[in-house]
Amino acid sequence: MAPKKKEDKDAPPPEDTNPYGVFVSVTMPSATVVLDVQDDAAAQRETHITLNIPGCHVPWASAHTAPSEGGVYQYSVVKHFRRSGGQDGLLQLINGVLTVTVNDSATNAVLASATVDQLQGFAIGQNTWSTEGLDLVPAAEVPEGVPKARSARLAFASIALQERPLPEGADAAALAAAPPPPEAELPPLLPYSYVSGEAAEKGNMVELVVSGLSPLPPNLQAAADAAGGKLHVTVGLALPGGGPAVAVSLAVAGGRVAAPAFRRELLPPGCLQALQYALEDGLPVVLEVARYVSAEGMADPAFEGYHAAAAAPALAAGLGAAGATEAAAEGLSLTAWAASGAKTCLPPYTAPAGKPKPVEAEVPPAGTCLWEKAGAQLAVSLRFARPVVPAWRPPPPPPRPLLELIPPRDLTPKPPPTTAVDEFKAKVRVIARALAEEYKAVLPPPDASVAAAAAGGGAEGRHKALIFELNRSGKYAQMRDSLKTAVVSLVREKYRKSGSMSPNEMALLYNDLYGSLLAAVHSSLNDLVDAAAARPRAPPPAPVPDKQRLGELLELAAQAEAMGDTDRAELLHQRRLLAKNDAQVWYEYGTYCLRRGGAKRGRAEECFREALALEPAHRGALLALLGCSVAAGRNTDPAYLESAEAAAHRLLDVAGRSSLDAWAALAVVYRAYGEAKRAELASCEQEMARLEKQQLAAAAAAASAGVSPSPSYGEGRAGGNGGGVPATEPSTASAGSVAGSAGELQARSFISLANTLLESLALPAEAALALELAAGLRHWPSVGPDTRTLHALAGALAEQALARAAGGGAASAAAEAMLTPGSSVLSMMRADAGEAVSSVAAEAAWRCRLLVAQLHKARGATDEAIRFYQSFIAITQQHAPSTPPPPPPPPPPPPPPPPQEYIEAARSSGRLAEVPLSAWLELAEAYAARGQARFAADVFLLGASARPGCAVLWRGAGRCFVGAEELGPADMALSEANVLDPEDPEAWGWLALVALREGRAEDAEKALAFGLRCGLGDPGLLLDIAAEYRAAGQRRAEQRVLQEVAVKLMPESCSARLLLARCLVAQRCGAEAAEAVAAARQLAAHEDDEAAVAELEAELRGMA
């Protein structure tokens, strides 16, 4: 027996013929190959296609095929390459390429080839690729006797990742060992993916390409030769933010590294968010270079000398741009790895066991970088299958733009409609001008002598001649006919149809018509005379209030609203609406309706729509309509959110695409939509981050150049175009922002929007929504303390407003919770106790004192409320500029209680004008509730010194002086209030009361008359006036006042009817008194009332 041949260890393993598993299917039906041949016989040479994909040990070859007409080879290639599953199989495929060659079948020489690098799509869930037409590159050299290919082109090529699952219950090992059945008997191949659905949707793939690394250190090639070629240089990259490391191994041969070379790795969805944030924040990208020896028995003592780092900021900058997938960096210098301080991603060097031979005899000193000494430079590129930082997609436009929902109104004045009288007057003017020209034509020349002028009968003769000529020429008839037509039109317009009328009635009609026509003729002739004399008539006064009066009415309305007099505030706003073409007037009335709440919310939206119809670019109205629509969409009908979206897009167009505030408003709208608009919200946040980075860079550049930031740095802060959006204070908007961290400007934009929604528009829930977005920013943990303080203050104010809106015990419960020791409100209030306190913290502490006072008032703790109100006012002196104090109003107050020392200190402060009107009113009300009218008057006077034009403060001071029985100061304060607001009915009423107590009955009568005419409706004040009349014995005047109270103001009050009845009884007016007593009998609700009624009835019977 012949001995068995020794098996060839290098022989490739046989092809895997298992018909079940994962397959890469390649389809190539035909190709057109043009050969460079001289005769037809050579043109019929057979060729075949070979395919080689990662994992193939031997390229697969198709059947030999002869060409058909036109050099078309019908290869009909459909080849299924079985590959292993799992991540190892996927990494093998994506790090390789499909190689296609057209070979000469006789010699197997390569005629043309192509490389298809499309297997990488399998990493992100793509399982098919195809192309119509694939050009192959002809081979430059072929063996002798083999024709060259001039061109080669595949008609079609496709790659598909498929799977044929095992039959249920089948034995995988037995099926793999058995001969494969025919293809027709096998189950069909199904689409397959190496990655899960989530990874296919959100995963990514990274590719690191090393383009070059040169020059090499001098001893590197010698070390590679000593290691027998088993030495390689590895370039690795640890992606910022986490994720797998990417390492490319480069062989060393011929004095250079084998480049370019690449390596691809999978990026799971879990690490992409951190990678995105790292690229957006510009975290450094550091490449690591190291040398490894894999030869057995050899060590590398110079490992640290070849261990280097290369910083690549261009990679981070390029890939940090939105939508970028690839970035390259060239000329990267290498330095010692130990000096870089970066975290290594390549495996550490481990010396082999035993006594290995060093691959390089010379060991460099510690800290030496041989790459740096050689001047080596690295060139790499980094590519992702999908953008790590998503491409910014602008939010889609709203279904209907706002200009379509609210079309702009044409304010061009329209000419008044013409009437028959106007046409008649126009005819008269035309005829008058024509007659004037005729008369002018017959007049003698100016330089004619008296005899010449008297010739022909003089003026009378010329007049007769003119009449004759007008009749002869027919001009008179034309004038008469034209007037006749106008008169007929006038009669038809004015008298319609006369019907059957008597001669007397017709005579009256003719007389009226004649009078009308004569008046029209005189009016027309007078207009002609006035125009000729250049003395036009003065236009009638405009019925619309001017700007100054509109401002005065707005201030008075705000004062009435602060006092709780909503009826008068509504009346004053309605008077301002006489300026119906002023968008700002409609906007301010809409904000008032929003603050009123309830049924007024619908009217507020109508006002904002009217303002936008008048002025489509009114930013305040746009933001107000946005807020109203968001509130309605969240609480009632989500369809309102479409209107809010349209308003937000319009605001973005008006404010400019670089306005952070406008983008913040749009983000609030998308946040109100919820998950339905999550992608749009992310788009807004992405654009805001880009704008912030741009503005911070511009501000930093300006600061480094010693130039103040341009206005665009704070663009969008002010309301503009009609106001309505208050500008953020410099201390809260831009101070420290340049040096601040990322996210600072974005957070400030949301906080500014929240303040506007809260304070100007009374929309606390929507303000809380904006604050949620601020706290949800990615960089919120790193924002500065001032921004956090502003956010906490706005949140506390929103919480307080929501509790007030809830009503009932919610306000008291919220006050208790906010006043808990350690709460954010108390912490902010005490934040100004140190020495180095920022202006923002000081402002917040001052504002929190007022908030704490209001919270104590809400929970019924009057004493505590007074203490913090006084503290709020007192702190104004600590931060006030040194300005001379206003003169204190007379008279000087008596010694105050202990807390009053703060008011005395604040009196000389120039910042008292910043104290809101509500604080003065609430503090005075707290004193009045304790029965300390004199101290309440002091508060009113101090407030009036800070706001000398505020009528309600003077009126409050006068009222408190009346309560303290100081009539002189009361009269002075009330007179000042009356001058500032002559239409305030309560000021007139209190003036009447003071006059009565001082014995000035005539002045009291006039003041009371004016007060009643202006709508005096305070029953208590009127009853006090009636009591003064009673004390003075003026029963008739008392009766008038009591009738006003009993009939108009308190028609359901039994006591008012009884007072009126007693007054009438005192005047012996039995019948009227009986009616009043009868009405009181019907209104009597308890025994005391019935007893009083019975007493009066008995008295009336005694009168009878």
Curated annotation (Swiss-Prot):
Q: Which SUPFAM superfamilies match?
A: TPR-like (SSF48452)
One GO biological process term is: cilium movement
Query: Where does the record place Basic and acidic residues bias?
Result: 1-12
The record's Gene3D superfamilies line, in alphabetical order, gives: Tetratricopeptide repeat domain
Q: Where is the composition biased (Gly residues)?
A: 716-725
Q: Where in the cell is it found?
A: Cytoplasm, Cytoskeleton, Cilium axoneme; Cell projection, Cilium
Alphabetized UniProt keyword annotations? Cell projection, Cytoplasm, Cytoskeleton, Repeat, TPR repeat
Organism, by scientific name, is Chlamydomonas reinhardtii
Task: Write down what this protein is called.
Answer: Cilia- and flagella-associated protein 70
Q: Which PANTHER family match?
A: CILIA- AND FLAGELLA-ASSOCIATED PROTEIN 70
Q: Which family does it belong to?
A: Belongs to the CFAP70 family.
Provide GO CC annotations from the record.
axoneme; cilium; outer dynein arm
User: Which parts of the sequence are annotated with region: Disordered?
Assistant: 1-20, 400-419, 706-737, 878-900
- Gene name as annotated: CFAP70
What residue spans carry the Pro residues bias annotation?
A: 882-900
Q: Where are the TPR repeats?
A: 583-618, 846-879, 917-950
